[in-house]
A protein has these predicted regions:
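Amphipathic alpha-helical packing segments from all-alpha helical-bundle domains
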Residues: 87, 101-111, 121-141
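An amphipathic alpha-helix signature
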Residues: 8, 51, 90, 94, ...
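Helix-turn-helix
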Residues: 6, 10, 14-56
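Short, Lys/Arg-enriched anionic-surface-contact patches
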Residues: 1-3
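Hydrophobic alpha-helical connector segments
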Residues: 52, 65-104
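Hydrophobic/aromatic residues within well-ordered alpha-helical segments
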Residues: 46, 53, 57, 61, ...
Length: 141
């Protein structure tokens, strides 16, 4: 794991437990085992680090959906699922829910969004899109 990946992983863990305001750059750097100034070589600010985590996790969700053949955006074609065998559809839905709740990154990301949704409109919107709307969308097939 690269230093940047360690920073992202550690920051996600701290932000998901303590919230944005509760986790300091110093705490993150200390947990990674680097100097605070070294963290700034990878991310220019705490905000950039937080936004980088959110962007990365959304990209991972999109990769999962698209890699599984699931629609990700509202404009994606859902007609592909008409006439799909029930067993295949059930397996697809179960795999999707396991991803949402069992994947370690996703579980921490969900907690981060839950904590941040009241102060960060973008986090609220992403939480609704991924953990409410997507679940309903997958069930609607």
């Amino acid at each position: 794991m690269t230093t940047k990946e360690k920073i992202l992983d550690t920051a996600l863990e701290l932000f998901s437990r303590q919230g944005y305001d509760g986790a300091s750059v110093r705490d993150i750097a200390r947990a990674v085992g680097i100097r605070e100034s070294s963290l700034y070589n990878h991310f220019p600010s705490k905000r950039a680090l937080f936004d980088g985590i959110v962007d990365f996790c959304v990209q991972q969700a999109e990769l999962y959906f698209r890699g599984s053949g699931l629609p990700f955006d509202q404009g994606d074609d859902t007609s592909l699922y008409q006439g799909i065998p029930a067993e295949r559809l059930h397996a697809l839905i179960e795999r999707t829910f396991r991803y949402f709740f069992d994947d370690p990154w996703n579980a921490r990301f969900r907690r981060l969004l839950l904590l941040s949704q009241f102060t960060e409109p973008r986090c609220r919107d992403i939480y609704r899109q991924l953990y409410r709307d997507k679940c309903v969308q997958v069930q609607a097939f």
